Every structure is written in C-alpha cells, then in structure tokens.
Amino acid sequence: MTTVHLLHAGYAGDRVGSSIVLVRDADALIVVDPGMVARRSLILEPLAGLGVAPEAVTHVFLSHHHPDHTVNIALFPNAEVVDFWARYKDDLWLDHDGDGYRLSPRSQLWLTPGHTEEDATLVVEADDAVYAMTHLWWREDRTPDVDPLAAADIVIPGHGGPFRVGR
C-alpha cells in the first residue's frame, strides 16, 4: 500500500513554513522537506497520529537546500537524506544522478530546476492518485524540462496546501 499524508501545509509571507509530507511505500517511510515550522510539534504530532516514530523514518527527501525546507532534518536520526545530487547517511556522502532515482518502488525523483538549480520533485504513484511534491516557484531562466503538473493528479507545493490538477 502506498499512501501520502500531509503533515503540515506550508505558507509564505510575513512568516514562512514548508509543506511537510509523509510517504508510506513498501518498507519506506519518507518525509519530504522537514523545514521551518512554528513548533516542532507541528511535525511530530501528525507523525505520531499516523503511528510513526521519528526514528522509524527511512528517508528524508529535500526538494532543495534552503533552510525553510531543511531545518528539522535532525528530527529523523536514522533516515538517509536524499536530494537530487546525492544521498547522505551519518558521515557518508554518496553522489548519484537523481533524475529518475527511486526512493521506493513507487516514488521517483525528477530534476525540476526553477526556484534553485538543484530543485527536485518527488513523484509518488499512491493508491489513490499520482502526487507531485514540488516547489512551484520557477525563474524564467530555469524552466524545468519536465512539467510535474502534467504528471500529477495532486500537487503538494513547497508552500501551500495540496491541489488537484485538472486534466
């Protein structure tokens, strides 16, 4: 069973907080963009409500390296941290080509530069829909080659609540 759970709907304005997501797929528990929130309990309580301890999280996926998306990585001490360029675990840094890299059987990274050159999108084929966790702030000179909106039924942007893509 593959499921996607919004733990925290992000926002941007006078304050900033990232959208934080849990993906369950096979043996993988993936947290997406554990960034800035007003209180860490806004991440930990929804996780506990799903029966997930922070120590059980297997992967943390970072869409890019800005603090508003990364500041709470340490909440997940056993997780492998994955971005578009590499995987990080303890003191290991393993370079990889992230385009098409699979974190789990039904989740895949896509290079989608826009907000930053290393922006990546996590596309998940869940049981109920295809989800894209992506930043959605593109600069004109960094338009991605692939459109995560075209592939998804539901988009969870880096800052904001999920929305359905009309096709």
Summary of predicted features, one role per range:
Residues H5-L7, F61, V82, W110, ...:
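Hydrophobic/aromatic beta-strand patches that form the interior of the parallel beta-sheet core
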Residues V37-A38, L111, E117-R167:
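Metallo-beta-lactamase
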